Amino acid sequence: MIIVLSPAKSLDYETPPHVSHHTQPQFADDAAALIDELRRLSPQQIATLMSISDPLARLNFQRYADWSRASTPANAKQAVLAFNGDVYEGLDARSLSPDDLDYAQRHVRVLSGLYGLLRPLDLLQPYRLEMGTRFSNARGKDLYAFWGERITHALNAELKTRVGASRVLVNCASAEYFKSVKPKLLDARVVTPVFEDWKDGRYKIISFHAKRARGLMARYVVEGRIDSPDALKDFASEGYAFDASASNDDTYVFRRRAGA
């Protein structure tokens, strides 16, 4: 079983990693090709393209200039320790043991606009490039065209090694990022957990809580060494519980009545 996550815009390069083991991104050459094209943009063009402030555009202009094809512990950090958004607060990889991270390395993947597909311990240099960015490039009109079927083929290569009930892709990514995967071409069952909170008299998806819950689900999979979709239904972190009446074979709905 493989669980896929979205990346985070917020990054942490201040906290030293608690493990030294690291790996190299599979699509580093593709990332380098994108960086070459991004370096042609001025800070003003970056601000317009990404709808970000001028200071943030200047920061990323410098990030692209500093980016190196060679990722080392001196200029990069393990992806799961560098990402710092809501999902990663739920995952809390900094508190995972080396054995947990080793399991995550085999069962967790992060979709990325720049790197395509990352393992948790792949070295990540600072960047900002959301998958939904309409960045025209040598391969097409946007990043979905750039990545094409590459991400799907990479996932299939890994899923091919799984057998039976473990040949499952658990989609804990956002719609923006999962659009880079071609489910019809996947040689696996896709299960999507959905997290809803009770608010204003009904259950609804609340973005902040749902993002955190995706990270909590990934942590549950890692710590519990979960390798079958049925075991996902026992997830009960921070008050969530599986609701069979709202779920089906492809979508597992987890609900809670109060905040964490």
From Swiss-Prot:
Signal peptide: none annotated. InterPro entries: YaaA. GO terms for cellular component: cytosol. It comes from the Bacteria. One of its GO terms (biological process) is response to hydroperoxide. PANTHER family: PEROXIDE STRESS RESISTANCE PROTEIN YAAA, PEROXIDE STRESS RESPONSE PROTEIN YAAA. Belongs to the UPF0246 family. NCBIfam families: PRK02101.1-1, PRK02101.1-3. This is UPF0246 protein BPSL1241. It comes from Burkholderia pseudomallei (strain K96243).
